[in-house]
Curated annotation (Swiss-Prot):
Gene3D superfamilies: photosystem ii from thermosynechococcus elongatus (1.10.10.670). Binds multiple chlorophylls and provides some of the ligands for the Ca-4Mn-5O cluster of the oxygen-evolving complex. It may also provide a ligand for a Cl- that is required for oxygen evolution. PSII binds additional chlorophylls, carotenoids and specific lipids. This is Photosystem II CP43 reaction center protein. It comes from Guizotia abyssinica. Residues 1-14 form a propeptide. [CaMn4O5] cluster binds at E367. NCBIfam families: psbC. The lineage of its organism: Eukaryota, Viridiplantae, Streptophyta, Embryophyta, Tracheophyta. The modification Phosphothreonine is found at T15. Its main location: plastid.
Length: 473
């Protein structure tokens, strides 16, 4: 058997137990990678790697379209979205499609169109993927030099980085244009319980936008996750889109500086590790955003946040007992603190009881009842509207807690079955995926650094310890 590693090889070698397996000429002997190492076999075949990536994009878009149509087919307009296990329709609704005042779905046709467009796109991508994987040129450098590359070519790599940044910037501006010119987006803070509106008065002040980045991530500060009005969100996308596009142009026009050439590892596996690290960070940020933020992820579609459901429970029983004659301003609870209302250490009037720990919740159904010093007793006695009562009762019974087949021991409706909040699903999945991507980053970064340093050459199969051990059978 040939020695499956060589000192010349820039990439570490993975091997399969059966060295005879060949796939369309891309076998283990010629590439040093077994079939299960997937795209590693294509490291130096830019045409085939393009096919793999386009086919992968096709699978992603197909999943989006198919799942979109599945959710449309199962959607019941009379029930809230968050009761129906939906994760795609809430995103479309947040963009202002198909919904009216209060987040009520008035037209499902835009959702159907979205699904069909994604399916058609996936067919085009799928064809392109199969073409480039099976029929197209193995390498692009000769026929299409613009699309060809060598992994060690630092200038070409930063050009590719620049193109990616420009595409990301265009994506950010698509949201801006939707909010400004194409019907607007759903604003959970619109008076009377939320509505679709065009965002006209963008926040473009750098001190406000970048102030979010300088906030503490803890408690009442909440870093960028604390954003609570759409003007700031859309204005932030203007800044982000501009920075991405300008940065992309800069990376296309310039070559890496000497310090960057020295500090970074310039190989395919290194770029993979950088990408995995970035996606990991995105996953963790998305987890926090969907869990805590009810502006970017309106509760009408995703269900209440944890603090929101807790405060809604306190509010619901305050309303009930006030109707029954309780003096909610002075009633004492079992600890001697206020039963319904109390003061925070800094003097604001907040809800009493266990929900005191969520005193800094902001929610559209609650804010109208606040005064300059927290909750306003006179407003709580005179100004509570029916829609606020309905919404808080609904949120109280739909806390984002989570076991798969129960409702976690909080106040529930008599017929609440198998409710799991989309917030729970989205936050948990993004946390877990963010963690896995981080582990992938560590793995590939370690291999890339070892390969660059020249000391990872795979295992010498002639003297591998397992060869001298008794077979399992």
């Amino acid at each position: 058997m040939k020695t499956l590693y060589s000192l010349r090889r820039f990439y570490p070698v993975e091997t399969l137990f059966n060295g005879t397996l060949a796939l369309a000429g891309r076998d283990q002997e010629t590439t040093g990678f077994a079939w299960w190492a997937g795209n590693a076999r294509l490291i130096n075949l830019s045409g085939k790697l393009l096919g793999a990536h386009v086919a992968h994009a096709g699978l992603i878009v197909f999943l989006a379209g198919a799942m979109n149509l599945f959710e449309v087919a199962h959607f019941v307009p009379e029930k809230p979205m968050y009761e129906q296990g939906l994760i795609l329709l809430p995103h479309l609704a947040t963009l202002g499609w198909g919904v009216g005042p209060g987040g009520e779905v008035i037209d499902t046709f835009p959702y159907f169109v979205s699904g069909v467009l994604h399916l058609i796109s996936s067919a085009v991508l799928g064809f392109g993927g199969i073409y480039h994987a099976l029929l197209g040129p193995e390498t692009l450098e000769e026929s299409f030099p613009f699309f060809g590359y060598v992994w060690k070519d630092r200038n070409k790599m930063t050009t590719i980085l620049g193109i990616h940044l420009i595409l990301l910037g265009i994506g950010a501006f698509l949201l801006v244009f939707k909010a400004l010119y194409f019907g607007g987006v759903y604003d959970t803070w619109a008076p009377g319980g939320g509505d679709v509106r065009k965002i006209t008065n963008l926040t473009l002040s750098p001190s406000i936008i970048f102030g979010y980045l300088l906030k503490s991530p803890f408690g009442g500060e909440g870093w960028i996750v604390s954003v609570d009005d759409l003007e700031d969100i859309i204005g932030g996308h203007v800044w982000l889109g501009s920075i991405c596009i300008l940065g992309g142009i800069w990376h296309i026009l310039t070559k890496p500086f000497a310090w960057a050439r020295r500090a970074l590892v310039w190989s395919g596996e290194a770029y993979l590790s950088y990408s995995l690290a970035a996606i990991s960070v995105f996953g963790f940020i998305a987890c926090c955003f969907v869990w805590f933020n009810n502006t970017a992820y309106p509760s009408e579609f995703y269900g209440p946040t944890g603090p929101e459901a807790s405060q809604a429970q306190a509010f619901t029983f305050l309303v009930r007992d006030q109707r029954l004659g309780a003096n909610v301003g002075s009633a004492q609870g079992p600890t001697g603190l206020g039963k319904y209302l109390m003061r925070s250490p800094t003097g604001e009037v907040i809800f009493g009881g266990e929900t005191m720990r969520f005193w800094d919740l902001r929610a559209p159904w609650l804010e109208p009842l606040r005064g300059p010093n927290g909750l306003d007793l006179s407003r709580l006695k005179k100004d509570i509207q029916p829609w606020q009562e309905r919404r808080s009762a609904e949120y109280m019974t739909h806390a984002p807690l989570g076991s798969l087949n129960s409702v976690g021991g909080v106040a529930t409706e008599i017929n609440a079955v198998n409710y799991v909040s989309p917030r729970s699903w989205l936050a948990t999945s993004h946390f877990v995926l963010g963690f896995f991507f981080f582990v992938g980053h560590l793995w590939h970064a370690g291999r890339a650094r070892a390969a660059a340093a020249g000391f990872e050459k795979g295992i010498d199969r002639d003297f591998e310890p397992v060869l001298s051990m008794t077979p399992l059978n």
